[in-house]
């Protein structure tokens, strides 16, 4: 069931572009492209997806397939992120897309992260506008792995900051330093979801590089 504010958001924006030029990609020989967003460093030929399922080689360029594609939109207590000492007692606007660069067998959001859920297009500025309209002090990128939708998260986080909305990132932390450092000035709080305690387990169980 959609709440009135969710219907309003989806009705206003409807469908939009399904491809967006990806950042942190390197063109290689024979039309292949190498992604430098996360440690997988996927090298893909024309029409092939990265391991995250959200980035693809299209005409010799890496594109983001989930830019603005919101699959889950909700209003949560900030403690559900879970954050205990950041703006306690407040609600946060939570948004997620699809795709993940890990493959944990115990993922509670597997249908979102690795499936093909229905989505609606919401431009980056739409998230800040919705948070302000609903009088919610923060915006959370959650549900799936936000880093595999880096371009939209980056744009939405910047516009949220400009609107005075706090930004929360719920992530597995599996990202390269350069893109993370570029995003951090627009992030107010972060929950890095620890999946395992050893590199071996990350590789053999969680699908890390």
Where do the protein language model's features map onto the residues?
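Conserved Radical SAM active-site core
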Residues: 57-190, 198
């Amino acid at each position: 069931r959609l709440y009135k504010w969710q219907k309003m958001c989806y009705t206003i924006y409807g469908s939009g572009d399904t491809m967006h030029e990806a950042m942190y990609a390197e063109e290689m020989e024979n039309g292949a492209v190498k992604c430098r967003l996360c440690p997988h460093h996927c090298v893909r030929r024309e029409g092939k997806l990265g391991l995250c399922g959200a980035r693809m080689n299209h005409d010799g360029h890496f594109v983001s397939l989930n830019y603005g594609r919101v699959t889950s939109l909700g209003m949560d207590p900030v403690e559900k992120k879970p954050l205990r000492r950041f703006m306690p007692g407040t609600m946060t606007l939570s948004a997620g897309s699809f795709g993940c660069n890990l493959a944990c067998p115990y993922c509670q959001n597997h249908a979102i992260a690795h499936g093909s859920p229905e989505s609606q297009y919401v431009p980056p500025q739409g998230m800040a506008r919705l948070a302000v309209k609903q009088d919610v002090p923060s915006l959370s990128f959650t549900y799936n792995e936000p880093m595999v939708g880096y371009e939209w998260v980056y744009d939405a986080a910047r516009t949220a900051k400009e609107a005075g909305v706090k930004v929360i990132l719920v992530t597995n932390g599996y990202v390269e330093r350069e893109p993370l450092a570029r995003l951090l000035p627009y992030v107010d709080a972060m929950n890095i979801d620890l999946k395992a305690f050893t590199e071996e387990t990350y590789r053999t169980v969680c699908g890390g590089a």
